[in-house]
Structure formats: C-alpha cells, structure tokens
Amino acid sequence: MEPVKQVIKLTPFLILCIQIAYCWYDLLTVEDSFITIKYYLALSLLIINIGIYFWKFEKGLIITGIILLLSTFSLIYITFEVATNSFYIQFGSLKISTPDIHGFSLLVLIGYCIVNYDIIKMFRAKLALILKKL
C-alpha cells in the first residue's frame, strides 16, 4: 500500500490517539475528575491496537473501527466530558429508545467508514465466508 494511502487510512486512528491522550491529560490534571473503568478500557484497547498495527496493518484498521464503535455507544470513554444523545419512538405508553450515542465518536466513525470502505468490505466478505462454514 502506498505511504500516502496509509496515512489517510490512519487518520481516524491518529484522531483517536490524540483524543485519548488529551482525555487522560485532563483526567490527571483536573482535581475533581473520577477515572472509571471505561477510561482504562479505552486506554488499554488503544495500546493493544498500537501493537496490532505493527503486526498487521489491516487488522489494526479493523480494531480501530471496533474501538470507535464501542466509543460511539458509550461502552468506553475517549473524551473527558461525555455528552450523549438518545432518541425514542413512543407507541401509546410504550417508549422504544436508541442506545446513548456519543456525537464526537460517531463523527470520527463516519469518517473512518468513508476512508476505510475497502477494508470494511473485505472484512465483511471474510466474515460471511466464516459464518457460511458454520
């Protein structure tokens, strides 16, 4: 793969690294901050992802997408202040709501999907073959 294409494909990962570094800077310098397991999980997944990038580039890209997906649904935190939105549909007294969605992570995830569409398409085809064998 060309170096320019690799840098473009790495852009969401670099945004993720910068955001988590800034988040941990805020967590460690602000007095009233409370570090939860979701912050530790995000940091550990990022460190594992860095190692995977050195081992296999395409797998690192897939793991970056998984981290962004987890962050979008607030299962891990990559920002200091976590603001989420949730929408719902109401049928009489029944309320059906979406999971909490983190806007910044969703924006980076959309950019990731646009830049890495070919990798996602290839991963989807491999996953379909694996599931077909089962």
Descriptions of predicted regions:
Residues K56-F73, F80-Y88:
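Membrane-helix interface/capping segments
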Residues K5-L10, G103-I130:
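Membrane-water interface at the C-terminal end of transmembrane alpha helices
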Residues I15-Y25, L68-F80:
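Aromatic-anchored segments of alpha-helical transmembrane domains
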Residues A42-T64:
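Canonical alpha-helical transmembrane segments
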Residues I8-I15, K38-L45, T64-S71, F104-V108:
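Hydrophobic alpha-helical transmembrane segments of polytopic
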Residues D26-L41, S74-S105:
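Interfacial non-cytosolic loop connecting adjacent transmembrane helices
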Residues M1-L43:
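N-terminal signal-anchor transmembrane alpha-helix
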Residues C17-A21, I47-G51, L106-N116:
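Hydrophobic core of alpha-helical transmembrane segments in multi-pass integral membrane proteins
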